[in-house]
Structures are given as structure tokens and as C-alpha cells.
From Swiss-Prot:
Region described as G1: spans on this chain: 363-370
Location(s) in or outside the cell: Cytoplasm
Any GO CC annotation of this UniProt entry: cytosol
Nucleotide-binding found in the keyword field: yes
Protein name in UniProt: Translation initiation factor IF-2
Sequence segments annotated as region (G4): 463-466
The keyword Transferase is assigned to this record: no
Comp. bias regions, Low complexity: 181-190
Entry similarity comment: Belongs to the TRAFAC class translation factor GTPase superfamily. Classic translation factor GTPase family. IF-2 subfamily.
Biased composition (Pro residues): 68-90
Length: 856
């Protein structure tokens, strides 16, 4: 189908031969001819409307003068429209021709669709308006019906009340009629009332007739006598009801319904409250805090699709949503808020005063850290350490030229990584001790990393320069590989060559420390509550829990209530490193604190609080969090008991249960970490329990239950515990050097490993003939082609390069004699244990099996 636009459009024209025709103003017309198949055509008139609202006016005005009748009213308007209308069609015709020549079929179709859409929108709007009107009419009708129904019910209620009143009145009249004494006054009274209402002539006469009948009072004594006799008449009952009349049930019911309607219709003013919401809360408690009914909160949950009870616990997010839904303001409060304001209290700059520097001595084991500190302190600590190695963190103070320096000595053994990390965190300056006759070792590198992680400056102390093979320059060069640039190599790190044995250059080392401290401008506020870090903790017999702490801010005094980790207590005494009791501990002072409820973990921060109640609250919160972490860790590691047992059975892993008791928390931590590193895929150490303090009977009971061995590090078992262990057959091992402890546990765990099976190839033999011998079975006549064959060796039968049997050699004969072995090139006879499927051409491979004990 094609559309062609014809050029012979009929336009508005004025011709003498034709009648004057006028098109509608504001409408441009054009003709479009459509060509269909089979030669069919169709002409379509296309109109373009320009002004929508002036169409009717322009169409009606020019028609008026064309009417021949009514000449009188139209002489004035007739000439006016003609001069306006006659020239208008000419330019309009020219415009319509131009527009139709420019409009394409797509544009025409688009305009047609736009008109259709407009009509559809109008139709839809009209439908919506009708629907809204119908809905409003239905709503009005429903309200009218409700009003009519309410009026009808009210009328019925009034009619019912009226009927009840009439029935009651008739009953009273009937009762009075049956009673002779009361009958005449009742009739007279009724007649009087009727007469008064009518206002009749006999009113006076009737009123006069009432006077002689006035004494009606004998009725009451009669009723009382009848009541005393136990007889109850209708009259007496009715008269008694009138004397003590109460509201009827219907009246009470109507009153309650009216009260309920009033309560429902009454708009109560909503009081918005600030609801404090903890991390978990029950629905009942939340409703109480919102001053709402718990039933309403439960209904809200039911609307959300959740069936809840008032005693159910919900989380803080859900509680906040409920509070907001009920129009209240939620204030979230976490359990950790109990720790707010405990640490990091801002001090005013004018309150800060200079404090001594805290120096940590770090380095590899046996590089002379403790010896250097002994030389500085002029003491002998190394002699008191088991094995000559430091296994605790020691904190000391040294006076130099009127200035105080606090030293912290850390272990250098690989097992004490956590101790070194804690020492670096609590320090201001780190002294890296490196032996001049040695090189940079693994723990040296680890100490460098700890110091860099803590962001503290490093001073390199090159020790043992008094030895003949000392090479300090080699140490400086190796430190460059780990980004430690000393001053002599163009860096900014101070380095001092010292000798702890001879005391060489110790004064230079102290001067370097004071210089570095002066650069750092170390200050603290001593006039505030104390806070710091726990360096070490232990359980001492006779003194209880003892914690070595380093005061970092404020002043610690006896009597202060402190919280250290998950433990709290009131400070009973402060003891310095020389065992002397002190009254105060200013900033940068290491002291031993007595009075805690239990030994805290090394590395925990401590702070002084106002009251014991707050200290107890913080301690309980931290203990609860620690328990939750432990449970989550165990659940994540082991899962359920069935899963754990199935994993152990499938993997074949063996466990070595241990109970570890030590003198201080730091040593226990180091031992546990060292033993956990010994574990493999086949065997691992399981720490049933670890703690600081002596070995007690409870430890023996736990070991008996879990079938564990007890390890004591620098502690002993009391007599009761030893007796219980001997009776239960529990082994207790004592150690004072961590090397020996780790080596013994490693050897014991190695014994749990299954031995390694090793095969040694002996030789090959080819079957030449198969003999069937009575009482023996099939015997293979073979020639040894490679190696040798031994009696009792393991054999494999190979056929077509495929192993079809593996077993042991039963007999090995040569010329009817049993031999121990047959070398290559010789012939022999062989028989297998419990196997006789041998053929000529098979190859027998002989091998020896050895079981080798494995070690970790």
C-alpha cells in the first residue's frame, strides 16, 4: 500500500460562476491518495487544526450574513465579517499548501497518534472522575446507612427500655391489686393522678376522699413480719427492691460500652520518649522503657510475620526499629560503653611535665643484652637466670647524672616473640644489641621489625668488642640490608661500641639515650589518675597475684582501685625492682602491684577507676567477652563433637594432651606458642589448661580426666598434689629452661608418629619352570637376573609389566637345600606364602622392608 499526495488540493476561492465557499478558519486541509493492491485507490482528507478554542466562533460568524432573512438585526454586523473573512482564506490557502508539502507521512501518522493518545487520556480521566464520584457516592450511602442503623438501634433500645418500664409498672400494679391493705390507696392515688392530669371537676371531691384513707403505714410491719417468718411475697420483694434499688445489668452494660467508645474515640496525646537500647533486650523490657503494652509490641511483630513472646530477646537493630515505629527516639548503648573514659584522657599542655625515658633492650639470644644491663646497673642478673638466658621481662631504673632512665630487658629466645613485641610497644627508645663477633641473626631482624612497627627510635649497641674476632664494621654493613643506617654509614641511627664485660663506653651509651630522650621531649601529667601497661604477671605464694606494671601517665598510689585486663583490685602495696615498698609511682616507673583478684595477661593495659563497682563492671564485661571469644574459637576450630571425632579418625591425627603451669604469664605464653609450632598433620600438642601458679590438686584431677601430662615451669607441686598424682599415676615434669622443655615434648610427640616404611630393592628373578610338589604346592624354578634374592624377603609377582601379587617369600632352595640368599646368574626354587598362581615367564622382584623411627 502506498500513499501519494495529490497536488490538486481544493482551496478556498471566490469565483463568479461558483457559490462562495468558506472553509473552517484555523484548519488546513490536504488530500492524500492511498494506492492499494489490484489497482484500488482511496482519497483521504487530512486536516491540520491550529487553534482549538476559536474553531466554533470562526465557523459560526461567516454563516450569519449569508442568510437572506432577518435584514433588520444584521445590517451592522454583516459588512464587518465579510471584509475580515474574504481576504483570510487566500493566505490560509497558501500556508496550507506549504505545510502539506513539507509534512511527511510519518509526521502525519505521529500527529494522528498524538490526537488518539489525547483522546484516550481524556477518556481515562473521565473514567477516573466517574469512578471517584461513584466511590464517594457509595461512601456517602454507606455512612447514611450506618447513621440510619445507629438511629434504628437507638430507637429499639428506647422501645425496649420503655417496654421494660411498662412491664415493671404492670407488675407493681398487679402486686398492689393483690394486697388488700395497699389496694385502696393505690387505686385512689391512681385516680387522683388521672384527675390531676385531666383537671376535672371531681378533683376536689376525690382529694377529699383520700384523707380518711391516709394511714397506709401498717404495710411495712406486715412485710417485716412476713420477712421474719421467712416468707417472701411479690409485694414485699418489690417494695424492698425499691427501697435499696441498684442499677440494672442492661444499664451497667450500656455504661461500659459508652465508656469504651469514649476511650476509643478519645485521642490520647502521644508522648515521645528517649528509649535507651542495649545490645540485647527482651520485648517486655523494651515495652516498659517505651511505656507501651507488651501486647502491642507482640502485635507489631505478628504484623511483620514473626511470632514472638514478651520474654523473647531481640537485638539492638530490631529494638530500634520497634521504638521508631512507636514514635520514640532510640538511643543505642553498647556494653563496651562501660570502658568509655578509661584510657587516652586528654591532658592540658600546661599540666605536662618531663618524664624519664623508657628504654627496651632487644636483640638475639646470647648477644649480651642482660650482661649489658647488669653492667649498667652494676648488678648480676645473669647469674640468677636459669641456663644463663633471660626468660622474663625485667624492668629496672638507673640514675645517670641526676637523670633517671627506665630499662626493660626482653628475652632473645625465639619463643619469646610476644614478649619482645610488648616491650617495643611500651617503650620510648629501643636499644638493639648485636654481638661484634657474630652477625645479624633472626631475632635481631625481628627486634628491628618490632621497633619499626612501634615507631620508636633505635640505638645500636655493638657488644663484645673486647673479643679478638670482633668486627663492628661487618655488623654495620649487615644492618644496611634491613634499612638500619647508622651515623657512620651516612644515616641517622646512633651506634655505640660497648663491652659489657669490661664496661667499655657504657657512659657513651647512656649519653646517647639521654640525647635521644631530649630530642623526643618526653612529657606526662603526674597529677591525674594513673594508667599504663602490664609488663609481667605471676601468682606468688604468700603475696597472691603480683603484676609488674609500667606507669605511663598519672601517679599510682596504694589504695587506688585499678582494672588490668579482665582483673581488678585495690592496690595493697607497691614494690620497686629492689624489693622496697614505695608510696607513689610517678610516670615511667616500673613497680610490682599487689592486690589484684587474679594475674592479668602480660601486655594488658591498666587504669585507675573511681569505685569498686565500676571496676567490677568492667572486669565482668571483659571476662564475658573473653569467654565468648574462646567459645567461638573452639566452635570454629572443632565444630561439633561428632565432626571432631570423625576428622580425627579420618585424618589419623594423634594428640598429646598437656597441662602447663608456670611462674609468670609471659613464660606460659611463650611455651604454648612454641609447642603449637611443633604440630604436624599427624600429631599435635593439645593444651588442656595453662596458668600461672603452683601445681594444685585441681590440676591433678583435670589431668586424670583428660589423660594429660603436667609440665611445671619454675613452679612445684604441693604435697597434696604430689600424693594425688602418685595415686592417680599422673606424670609431673619440672623445667626451668625453655630449651629443655621444648626438646622433651618434641621427643615425646615424635614417639606418637607411626614409623616410616622404607623399601630396599634386592633383585629380580625370571621363572623358567613351574613344579608341582606334594605337600608344598607350586614351586617356581627361577634364574636370578639382577641383584640377589634373600630368604624371607618381600616379593612382587610381575606379569606383563603388571604387579599381580605382593607378599613374602616362603622358601628359597638351591639343589634341594635351603639357602639364605641366591646371587645373580644362579638358579633357585622359590615358593610364595598363600599364593600359587605362578606361570612361566613371570618376573619375581625381591625387596627388603625397613621401619624407621620418625622425628618431628
Amino acid at each position: 500500500m502506498t500513499d501519494t499526495k495529490t497536488g490538486d488540493d481544493k482551496t478556498l476561492s471566490v469565483n463568479t460562476k461558483k457559490t462562495l465557499t468558506i472553509k473552517r478558519p484555523g484548519v488546513e486541509q490536504g488530500t492524500v491518495r492511498q494506492n492499494f493492491s489490484h489497482g484500488r485507490t482511496k482519497a483521504v482528507v487530512v486536516e491540520t487544526k491550529k487553534r482549538k478554542f476559536s474553531r466554533s466562533d470562526e465557523r459560526v460568524e461567516p454563516v450569519a450574513p449569508m442568510r437572506p432573512k432577518a435584514p433588520a438585526p444584521s445590517p451592522a454586523p454583516a459588512p464587518a465579517p465579510q471584509p475580515r473573512e474574504t481576504p483570510r482564506p487566500q493566505p490560509q490557502q497558501s500556508r496550507s499548501g506549504v505545510v502539506l508539502n513539507e509534512l511527511s507521512a510519518d509526521e502525519i501518522e505521529a500527529r494522528r497518534r498524538a490526537l488518539q493518545d489525547a483522546k484516550l487520556r481524556e477518556t481515562e480521566e473521565r473514567k477516573r472522575a466517574e469512578e471517584e464520584a461513584r466511590r464517594r457516592a457509595e461512601e456517602d450511602e454507606r455512612r447514611q446507612r450506618e447513621r440510619e442503623e445507629s438511629a434504628r438501634r437507638q430507637a429499639e433500645e428506647e422501645a425496649r427500655l420503655k417496654a421494660e418500664a411498662e412491664a415493671r409498672k404492670r407488675a407493681e400494679e398487679e402486686a398492689k391489686r393483690r394486697t388488700p391493705v395497699v389496694e385502696t390507696p393505690a387505686v385512689v392515688a391512681e385516680a387522683v393522678e388521672e384527675e390531676e392530669e385531666r383537671g376535672g371537676r371531681g378533683g376536689l371531691a376525690k382529694r377529699g376522699a383520700v384523707k380518711p384513707e391516709a394511714p397506709v403505714r401498717p404495710v411495712k410491719p406486715r412485710g417485716e413480719e412476713e420477712r421474719r417468718r421467712g416468707k417472701l411475697t411479690l409485694n414485699s420483694a418489690l417494695s424492698d427492691e425499691e427501697s435499696t434499688r441498684s442499677r440494672s445489668l442492661s444499664s451497667m452494660r450500656r455504661r461500659q460500652e459508652k465508656f469504651k467508645r469514649a476511650m476509643q474515640q478519645e485521642q490520647r496525646e502521644k508522648v515521645s520518649r528517649e528509649v535507651v537500647i542495649p545490645e540485647t533486650i527482651t520485648i517486655q523490657e523494651l515495652a516498659q522503657r517505651m511505656a507501651e503494652r507488651a501486647v502491642d509490641v507482640v502485635k507489631y511483630f505478628m504484623k511483620q510475620g514473626q511470632i514472638m513472646k514478651p520474654g523473647d530477646v531481640i537485638d539492638a537493630d530490631t529494638a530500634e526499629l520497634v521504638a521508631v515505629e512507636f514514635g520514640h527516639t532510640a538511643k543505642r548503648v553498647a556494653e563496651s560503653d562501660v570502658e568509655e573514659g578509661l584510657f587516652n584522657i586528654e591532658d592540658r599542655p600546661e599540666d605536662l611535665k618531663p618524664r624519664p625515658p623508657v628504654v627496651t633492650i632487644m636483640g638475639h639470644v646470647d648477644h649480651g643484652k642482660t650482661s649489658l644491663l647488669d653492667a649498667i646497673r652494676k648488678a648480676n642478673v645473669v647469674a640468677g637466670e636459669a641456663g644463663g638466658i633471660t626468660q622474663h621481662i625485667g624492668a629496672y631504673q638507673v640514675e645517670q647524672d641526676g637523670n633517671t632512665i627506665t630499662f626493660i630487658d626482653t628475652p632473645g629466645h625465639a619463643a619469646f616473640t610476644a614478649m619482645r613485641a610488648r616491650g617495643a610497644q611500651a617503650t620510648d627508645i629501643a636499644i638493639l644489641v648485636v654481638a661484634a663477633d657474630d652477625s645479624v641473626m633472626p631475632q635481631t631482624v625481628e627486634s628491628i621489625n618490632h621497633a619499626k612497627a612501634a615507631g620508636v627510635p633505635i640505638i645500636v649497641a655493638i657488644n663484645k668488642i673486647d673479643k679478638p674476632d670482633a668486627n663492628p664494621q661487618k655488623v654495620r654493613t649487615e644492618l644496611l640490608q634491613h634499612e638500619v643506617f647508622v651515623e657512620s654509614m651516612g644515616g641517622d641511627v646512633l651506634d655505640v661500641e660497648v663491652s659489657a664485660i669490661k664496661g667499655t663506653n657504657l657512659d657513651k651509651l647512656l649519653e646517647a639515650i639521654l640525647l635521644q630522650a631530649e630530642i623526643l621531649e618526653l612529657k606526662a601529667n603526674p597529677d591525674r589518675t594513673a594508667e599504663g601497661v602490664v609488663v609481667e604477671a605471676k601468682l606468688d605464694r604468700g603475696r597472691g597475684s603480683v603484676a609488674t606494671v609500667l606507669v605511663q601517665a598519672g601517679t599510682l598510689k596504694p589504695g587506688d582501685v585499678i582494672v588490668a585486663g579482665s582483673e581488678w583490685g585495690r592496690v595493697r602495696a607497691l614494690v620497686n625492682e629492689r624489693g622496697e615498698a614505695v608510696k607513689v609511682a610517678p610516670p615511667s616507673t616500673p613497680v610490682e602491684v599487689l592486690g589484684l583478684q587474679g594475674p592479668p595477661q602480660a601486655g594488658d593495659r591498666f587504669a585507675v577507676v573511681d569505685t569498686e563497682a565500676r571496676a567490677r563492671e568492667i572486669s565482668e564485661y571483659r571476662q564475658r567477652k573473653a569467654r565468648e571469644k574462646a567459645v567461638a574459637r573452639q566452635a570454629g576450630q572443632r565444630g561439633s563433637l561428632e565432626q571432631m571425632m570423625s576428622q580425627l579418625q579420618s585424618s589419623g591425627m594423634k594428640e598429646f594432651p598437656l597441662i602447663i603451669k608456670g611462674d609468670v604469664q609471659g613464660s606460659i605464653e611463650a611455651i604454648v606458642n612454641a609447642l603449637e609450632k611443633l604440630g604436624t598433620e599427624e600429631v599435635r600438642a593439645r593444651i588442656v589448661h595453662s596458668g600461672a601458679g603452683a601445681i594444685t590438686e585441681s590440676d591433678i584431677s583435670l589431668a586424670e580426666t583428660s589423660d594429660a601430662a603436667i609440665i611445671g615451669f619454675n613452679v612445684r607441686a604441693n604435697k597434696q598434689a604430689r600424693d594425688a598424682a602418685e595415686q592417680a599415676g599422673i606424670e609431673i615434669r619440672y623445667y626451668n629452661i625453655i630449651y629443655d622443655l621444648v626438646d622433651d615434648i618434641k621427643a615425646a610427640m615424635s614417639g606418637l608418629l607411626s614409623p616410616e616404611r622404607r623399601e630396599t630393592f634386592l633383585g629380580n628373578a625370571e621363572i623358567l619352570e613351574v613344579f608341582n610338589i606334594t605337600k608344598v604346592g607350586k614351586v617356581a624354578g627361577c634364574r636370578v637376573t639382577e641383584g640377589k634374592v634373600e630368604r624371607g624377603a618381600g616379593v612382587r609377582l610381575i606379569r606383563d609389566n603388571v604387579v599381580i601379587h605382593e607378599g613374602k617369600l616362603k622358601t628359597l632352595k638351591r639343589f634341594k637345600d635351603e639357602v639364605s640368599e641366591v646371587p645373580a646368574g644362579q638358579e633357585c626354587g622359590m615358593a610364595f606364602e598363600n599364593y600359587e598362581d605362578i606361570r612361566v615367564g613371570d618376573v619375581i622382584e625381591a625387596f627388603r622392608v625397613e621401619h624407621v623411627t620418625r622425628t618431628l
